C-alpha cells in the first residue's frame, strides 16, 4: 500500500512540475491573409490560428518544423513555441499568404 501511495505521489509531483504552454496570441486567417502578418510571442507561449475565411488554409513553418494541416472555416489550431527566433510561415494551399513570428526569450 505504501508503495502505491508513494508512486502516486511521485506521479503527481512530476505532472505538477511539467511546464505547460502559456496562452499567447491569436492569428486570424481572413481574406487570404494572416492577420496580423507579423506577431511576437515569448518562449513557452502559444499562437492560436483561427480560420475565418471561406477557403481551407494551413499555417506552415517555412522550415517545415510545424504545420497546422488543413483548417476549414471556423477551425482553430494552437502551437507552442519552444525556442527563440524568427519564423517565416505560409499557407501551403495559397503560397502567396506569408507572415512572420518573432519568438523572444522568456525572461
Predicted regions and their residues:
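Extracytoplasmic copper-binding redox domains, predominantly the cupredoxin/blue-copper superfamily
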Residues: 2-107
Amino acid at each position: 500500500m505504501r508503495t502505491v501511495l508513494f508512486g502516486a505521489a511521485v506521479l503527481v509531483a512530476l505532472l505538477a512540475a511539467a511546464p505547460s504552454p502559456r496562452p499567447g496570441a491569436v492569428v486570424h486567417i481572413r481574406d487570404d491573409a494572416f492577420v496580423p502578418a507579423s506577431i511576437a510571442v515569448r518562449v513557452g507561449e502559444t499562437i492560436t490560428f483561427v480560420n475565418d475565411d471561406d477557403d481551407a488554409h494551413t499555417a506552415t513553418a517555412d522550415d517545415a518544423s510545424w504545420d497546422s494541416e488543413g483548417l476549414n472555416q471556423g477551425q482553430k489550431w494552437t502551437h507552442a513555441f519552444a525556442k527563440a527566433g524568427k519564423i517565416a510561415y505560409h499557407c501551403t494551399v495559397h503560397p502567396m499568404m506569408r507572415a512572420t513570428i518573432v519568438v523572444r526569450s522568456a525572461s
